[in-house]
Amino acid sequence: MKLIIAGGGTGGHLFPGIAVAEEFLSRDPANQVLFVGTERGIEARAVPAAGFPLELISAAGIRGKGGLGKLRGAAMMFNGYRQSCRLLDRFRPDAVLGVGGYASLPMLLAARTRQVPSFIHEQNAVPGMTNRLLSRFADRIFITLEESSRFFAGRRTLLTGNPLRRQILDRLGTRDQGPGIRDQEKHMTDSTGPASRVPGPRFNLLVFGGSQGAHAINMAMVAALPLLKRASVRLGITHQTGESDRERVAAAYRSAGVEARVLPFIADMASEYARADLVVCRAGATTIAEVTALAKACLFIPFPYAVDDHQRRNAEALLRQSACFMLLERELSAERLAALILQLAGDPRLVRRTGELAFSMARLDAARIIVDEILTPTN
């Protein structure tokens, strides 16, 4: 059987597609997967790195653009539609899965005209315009969060959760808090004394802003470094900055005398999650799926300009269950960020309990459910 997975742009769209591809290929060695994306998206480097074939098409957004921008976007989409039709004729897939992002629209429209079974996966609490449009004719609509069900036709909608890549699933057998939490709990002398006053244990912090980094988080961490340096907590920090901020952030850590690994991009997120006691990050749906599966306590700083503020709503779904911490970007400051990090570093039991509550909300079989549904029409 052959499957096309279309979309991307960001890791939040792409990584669930990679998870589905891994599951699909595991069912039958003869199965084939082809990814379709754009040259500007993360898929241009991440899909080949993951070992999957990729075809690039023209696609662009039109929402929020002026008249000329909308015309250009529409022209690119039409060209992408023609390219998609040619790909369908050449590859002859049995099904097409759209995972969101610009490339999914022309490919699924082409699949519709070629009468190829089509499916979409929505990662967020509030779906984007592309998936809202495609849902009108998709054979099946897979959703990550119950909150998004109101946007789609109920009889074709299935709550699956967000598919997890193999590198994350392989860590499930060792899921727990990072080594810093375990060491702090061992060193605590009584139930009331804050661990931050106990010398020795290191609290491991993972900071990232999605696959492309987040400038606001990067700059807030830079501003918070003097406050973190003065505190009596040993911090081990891994900070993924994105390409544009890497040198500036790395220089700030060196200047402040704070130990850190500063990276533009992290390919092996599973290993970094395993080392972390606390994760400071955006609230994209894929990030949430990964950290809940690995029982990680998170301080979410939702991207305030996400379409329909969906990142805040993603985080609030966990916050209502005391399964995370959240700081809105409009409230973000060096003082507040440092205070929250130090508060949590000093309370390992709270961090552990939050991670346990996060795990209780994880859905670990999303990729299996989606592949089962994709295979069903051909059985």
Curated annotation (Swiss-Prot):
Functional description taken from the UniProt entry: Cell wall formation. Catalyzes the transfer of a GlcNAc subunit on undecaprenyl-pyrophosphoryl-MurNAc-pentapeptide (lipid intermediate I) to form undecaprenyl-pyrophosphoryl-MurNAc-(pentapeptide)GlcNAc (lipid intermediate II).
Reactions mediated catalytically: di-trans,octa-cis-undecaprenyl diphospho-N-acetyl-alpha-D-muramoyl-L-alanyl-D-glutamyl-meso-2,6-diaminopimeloyl-D-alanyl-D-alanine + UDP-N-acetyl-alpha-D-glucosamine = di-trans,octa-cis-undecaprenyl diphospho-[N-acetyl-alpha-D-glucosaminyl-(1->4)]-N-acetyl-alpha-D-muramoyl-L-alanyl-D-glutamyl-meso-2,6-diaminopimeloyl-D-alanyl-D-alanine + UDP + H(+)
The keyword Membrane is assigned to this record: yes
Domain of life of the native organism: Bacteria
Organism encoding this protein: Pelobacter propionicus (strain DSM 2379 / NBRC 103807 / OttBd1)
Residue sites binding UDP-N-acetyl-alpha-D-glucosamine per the record: T10, G11, G12, N124, R165, S211, I266, Q311
Any GO BP annotation: peptidoglycan biosynthetic process
GO MF: UDP-N-acetyl-D-glucosamine:N-acetylmuramoyl-L-alanyl-D-glutamyl-meso-2,6-diaminopimelyl-D-alanyl-D-alanine-diphosphoundecaprenol 4-beta-N-acetylglucosaminlytransferase activity; undecaprenyldiphospho-muramoylpentapeptide beta-N-acetylglucosaminyltransferase activity
Pathway(s) the chain acts in: Cell wall biogenesis; peptidoglycan biosynthesis
NCBIfam families per UniProt: murG (TIGR01133)
Region (Disordered) location: 174-195
Gene3D superfamilies assigned: Glycogen Phosphorylase B (3.40.50.2000)
Protein name: UDP-N-acetylglucosamine--N-acetylmuramyl-(pentapeptide) pyrophosphoryl-undecaprenol N-acetylglucosamine transferase
Topology of the protein relative to the lipid bilayer: Peripheral membrane protein
Family: Belongs to the glycosyltransferase 28 family. MurG subfamily.
EC number, UniProt record: 2.4.1.227
Cellular localization per UniProt: Cell inner membrane
Keywords: Cell cycle, Cell division, Cell inner membrane, Cell membrane, Cell shape, Cell wall biogenesis/degradation, Glycosyltransferase, Membrane, Peptidoglycan synthesis, Transferase
GO cellular component: plasma membrane
